[in-house]
Every structure is written in structure tokens, then in C-alpha cells.
Amino acid sequence: MDTDKDKIFLDSQERMVKAITSLEKEFTKLRTGRASTSIVDTIKVDYYGTPTPINQLASIAIPDSSSITIQPWDKTAFNPIEKAILKSELGLTPINDGKIIRITLPPLTEDRRKDLVKLARKYGEDTKIAIRNIRRDANEQLKRLEKNKFISEDELKGFTEDIQKMTDNYIKEVETHCKTKEKEIIEI
């Protein structure tokens, strides 16, 4: 029955890693004061009637810390990309010179920075809750194994401690990610 315990442990670890990966993805979407391709990556463009992500229609570059350039591969994509950026709720104003679309990111206001920090903390807290729920699921599965006499009470205690150590490590990782993101947001 070692395989059941191992499966529970590995499954929990895999799910916790996915939770952290999801947090990292959410953090890339949060605008800090620096330009990032992830700010516009998810904007969908109505391209020949099909909603298409910008990164599938153009090259996106970061020439400096406060601007993004978008160079569509197809000349007919300029106007749809520009419209999609204006329609997005990002508050960005694209400048189309016919060869390239430039977006200059306005500096973040103090209030906007505070809102972004709150949002980052919320994402972090949601991830911690997800990790704790994974721990709870693993502990319940281990208790069932013990109840059905597949593992002893001592083994249950040891495996529960292992799951707790893993949980603590991933919670610390979440806290590190949150602190790093908060510093990025607050930096002017």
C-alpha cells in the first residue's frame, strides 16, 4: 500500500505546484510600473470574425520600461488590434503610425498602486487557501487508509507531518512571491 501513500503525496505536491504556477500567472497580469508583454498578451482581437490573442497576430516588444510596441504581421490587423486595446479595460492609448503600434504606459497613481497591492494580497491569500485545501484532502485520504487498516496510526502521524511540512514550504513560497510583487508595485 506504499503506492497509495506515495500517490497521495505526489498528487498533493503536483496540485500545490499548480496553485503556485497559477498565482505567478495572475501576478504577470498585474501592471507594476514597468511595461510587460503580459499586459497585452490576453487582449482578444476580432480578427476576421474570430477572437484572437494579440500575441498570435503580432510581435510584442518592450523597448523601454514604460512602453510596449506591437508589430502586426498582417497590415490588415492594425485597426482591429488598435480597437481591441482601446476597448480593453486597461486604460491604454495605442498610437498607430502604420508600421508599428506604440503604447506608452502612464505612471501608476498612489491609489492605483494601493489597489494593486490589495489585489496581489488577495491572489496570495486565495492561493494559500487552495494549498491548505489540498493538505486537508491529502490528510482525509490518509485517514481513510488508516481507518481501512492499510497504514498504522504511527504511519498516519508521520505522513500527516510530511504533508504539513510540504504545505508550510509552499505557503512560504507564496508569501515570498507576494512580497516580491508588492515591492514591484510600490517601486516608482
Curated annotation (Swiss-Prot):
The gene is frr. NCBIfam families: frr. Belongs to the RRF family. One of its GO terms (cellular component) is cytoplasm. This is Ribosome-recycling factor. InterPro entries: Ribosome_recyc_fac, Ribosome_recyc_fac_dom, RRF_sf. CDD domains: RRF. It is found in: Cytoplasm. One of its GO terms (biological process) is translational termination. Signal peptide: none annotated. It comes from Lawsonia intracellularis (strain PHE/MN1-00). HAMAP family: RRF.
